[in-house]
Amino acid sequence: MRLLLASSSPRRRELLTLLHRPFDCEVPEVEELRGANENAGDYVTRLAEEKAQTVAQRQQTPCLVIGSDTLISFKGQVLEKPESYEHFSQMMKQLSGQTHQVLTSVSVCQWNGHKVVARETALVTTQVEFAALSQGEIDAYWATGEPHDKAAGYGIQGYGGKFVKRIEGSYFAVVGLPLYETEQLLRMFEMTGEVDER
């Protein structure tokens, strides 16, 4: 059965190649709008499931689709991608010297050509401790251009990694796709013969 990754993220694509399974990528079209009473875990899980389902529904033949989403939570507040330098600087000051949570959900859905017939989802929470940052470090990081498309304005796998003192949990989940959990979900479908292992 064909395997698809519902993502436009080059980071997720690179991570999925580490599992040594053939797959194709398609960009999902999902409105990322958090409900008024939706907590962070429910929100990121819903987005992962919607990404997988929207790509699955375009397919004419049976397939498995992986969807994933990541967000950053600090003291109950979801930190989005920076809208401006001021927004970025504010978030970096919040995270400076503090521990925040990175929530990543991965969902695998099975599509039979007409409807979703099975779905398995995992939510991974990782604690990330930041070093204390100076304004000069914050400004220099913004100038690299890296923060612009990142949740909370940093990427652990890039320049932003030098601010991370410690993590407790999954490094790969912080990057965008928890490899262990993704592998386990795919194995669940393999047990029923639903994954093409060419």
UniProtKB/Swiss-Prot annotation:
Q: InterPro entries this protein is in? A: ITPase-like_fam, Maf-like
Q: Which domain of life is it from?
A: Bacteria
EC nos: 3.6.1.9
Q: Which Gene Ontology CC terms are recorded?
A: cytoplasm
- Disulfide bridge map: none
Question: Which metal ions or organic cofactors does this protein require, according to UniProt?
Answer: a divalent metal cation
Q: Which GO terms describe its biological process?
A: nucleotide metabolic process
Mention any Pfam family matching this sequence: Maf
Q: Which SUPFAM superfamilies match?
A: ITPase-like (SSF52972)
Q: Which reaction does it catalyse?
A: dTTP + H2O = dTMP + diphosphate + H(+); UTP + H2O = UMP + diphosphate + H(+)
Q: What is its main location?
A: cytoplasm
Q: Where is this site: Important for substrate specificity?
A: 11, 70, 157
Enzyme class comes to hydrolase
UniProt subcellular location: Cytoplasm
Q: Could you name the active-site residues?
A: 69 (proton acceptor)
- Keywords, ordered alphabetically: Cytoplasm, Hydrolase, Nucleotide metabolism
Family membership noted in the UniProt record: Belongs to the Maf family. YhdE subfamily.
Task performed by this protein: Nucleoside triphosphate pyrophosphatase that hydrolyzes dTTP and UTP. May have a dual role in cell division arrest and in preventing the incorporation of modified nucleotides into cellular nucleic acids.
Return the NCBIfam families for the record. maf
Q: What is this protein called?
A: dTTP/UTP pyrophosphatase
Name the species this protein comes from: Idiomarina loihiensis (strain ATCC BAA-735 / DSM 15497 / L2-TR)
